[in-house]
Amino acid sequence: MERFITWLARLQLAIGTLALVIFVAATLLQVLARYLNISVLWTEEVAVNAFIWAIFSGAAVMVREKKHFSFNALAMKLTGRTRLALVLFEQSVMLVFCVLCAFYSVEITDTFWHSKWVTLPSLQQGYVWLVLPVSFATSSLYLLEGMLKEIRVCVKREKPAWS
């Protein structure tokens, strides 16, 4: 299972990186077009939507790396069951948030699925909104993985991987 989750995180990071490249390319094209006094209408919308994909894809991977939201300063000072309780509480709160967001973002994605892009009406907005349930679902998976790792560390009395 860990191999699959690692593969999934790498895929998500690759998608986020590609989206960031598209964002930069669209932004540079927009700047160049303005400099040359040429009207390229679609670059702004492509840049914004690519940026959304880059941010949400990267945020999910950062949840797995424990670099997105954490109270590490306090957790690093605690040991044993006290540290485990704090870390599990923190990750449980995040998990509830991510599961709720995943659930409701499916509804949002469904609602806006057939909306069209303003400058590229052949494209559907649903593909942009799809990043929400994907990133929140994978964040939930990464949080569950992290919680299981923390429990294993405490049970085996090993040193945490992040310290």
Role assignments for model-derived ranges:
Residues 1-163:
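Alpha-helical transmembrane segments and membrane-interface helix-loop junctions
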